[in-house]
Amino acid sequence: MANDLPIAAVVRIAKNNGAERVGSDAAQAIADASQEYIAELTREASKYAKHAGRKTIKKEDVDLAVNELNI
């Protein structure tokens, strides 16, 4: 799967959370894992929106999905 997350943003987030340096392969691995997390969260939140008769995902759908996925 192609990754749509900018590597510079991934590195910046990692550094803002304690990493002093981030290798390019590590940044790519973090980006890939993050994209999969976002995809799974979106799939789950979409189920809640559809169940409520909506096409638009709302914050409440994301909150429910986070709880459902235990993340």
Where are these regions (language model features)?
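Terminal helix-to-tail segments of small alpha-helical proteins
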Residues: 1-71
